[in-house]
């Protein structure tokens, strides 16, 4: 996770990116 920033930590965009990255990794 290179986008581990406080700004993307409490935003819906960060969660979406996290889910997308998780899905792409699987």
From Swiss-Prot:
Native organism: Cereibacter sphaeroides (strain ATCC 17029 / ATH 2.4.9) (Rhodobacter sphaeroides)
Cross-link (Pyrroloquinoline quinone (Glu-Tyr)), chain numbering: 16-20
Disulfide bond positions: none
GO BP terms: pyrroloquinoline quinone biosynthetic process
Keyword Cell inner membrane: no
Function: Required for coenzyme pyrroloquinoline quinone (PQQ) biosynthesis. PQQ is probably formed by cross-linking a specific glutamate to a specific tyrosine residue and excising these residues from the peptide.
Pathway(s) it belongs to: Cofactor biosynthesis; pyrroloquinoline quinone biosynthesis
Short name of any one Pfam family annotated for the protein: PqqA
Record lineage: Bacteria, Pseudomonadati, Pseudomonadota, Alphaproteobacteria, Rhodobacterales
Keyword Repressor: no
Superkingdom: Bacteria
Protein name: Coenzyme PQQ synthesis protein A
Record keywords: PQQ biosynthesis
Record family assignment: Belongs to the PqqA family.
């Amino acid at each position: 996770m290179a986008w581990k920033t406080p700004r993307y930590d409490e935003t819906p965009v960060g969660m979406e990116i996290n889910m997308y990255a998780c899905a792409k990794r699987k």
